[in-house]
Amino acid sequence: MNLDTSPLQTPFDLKQLSLRNRLAVAPMTRVTATPDGLPTATMQRYYQRFAQGGFGLVITEGSFIDEAWSQTYENQPGMASDDQAQAWRPLTAQLQASGTRSIAQLQHAGALSQFNRYRPGQTIAPSAVPPRGLQMPFYRGEGAYPIPRAITQEEMADVVAHFGSAAARAVGLAGFDGVEIHGANGYLLDQFLTAHTNLRTDRWGGALPQRLEAAVATIQAVRAAVGADVPVGIRVSQGKVNDFGHKWAEGEQGAETIFGTLADAGVDYIHLTEFEAWQPAFGAEGPSLVQLARRFAPGLTIIANGGLHDADRALQLLAHGADLIALGRGALSNPDWPRKLEQGLPMKAFDRSILGPIADIKASELAAA
């Protein structure tokens, strides 16, 4: 490799977290927890490979936040109870002992729940709008999504509170260094952001600033729960798992509103995920979403994710204004991606069988590491 990859290898401070490099593992749903939401020894081995491989930061797969409506997939881990949170502690301690920091992603499925042991076959969402697309079979889903029921004001207050209590457990009991709110990919907070899935006329719906109220209230609850010193971030995307090509209808003006509002709400970082993060955000030309985030939220840390397993693309996104690069497919194929980069070793191509027929963590995957 003839590229100067040293910018990816420089340390970075995320609030009070000192990261050894600019490389993070992106959150990836692996449905390998116990049926009651406890992380497993297999998950611990899976995550430890990334620490041993040199990643400075690991952002875990989304954990559901309550024993009500938030669970998204069968065998998804939870942060809804003290038992679930405490079961994360050996994993986070092992990562930290290896010099890798860890952030817990917190998730509410909303209308895109494919399995919920607490409310079987039922979903809630901003409005009773049938979700586009079909459930994902590699997460044990089949057929159309259920038509959700519109969430009540009281239930929305519970959602916000549960994000806060889950964040407190993640830091206080599970031992994570920070928390990330899942506001991307078509899940609940993204459903509030999106005009065609949010038809409400109360404080949670209407024009774009009102549709952002759910994210703002959640950020404020999480910040209050973890305090001023703990890093709090939010993941944001245009595309959704059930609506891959979706773009923000308001274009760059909407991006200004979204990024400015999230910054004002008190997050420390925005984690942007796009299929190809270097591409123009809107149309065939123009700035990438990372460039827009840097323009409209200049004081925040920006994490870029999306097709950045090629080092030249990762470097391009640093030049666009990203501070950290989060790898998904690249990390799955090469849990030692940072070590290989440093030593100039070839990277393995992504093997799609890792995520099929079910996207759980496989023994062959761990053996190959």
Which residues are covered by each model-predicted region?
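Flavin-dependent oxidoreductase catalytic cores
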Residues: 1-369
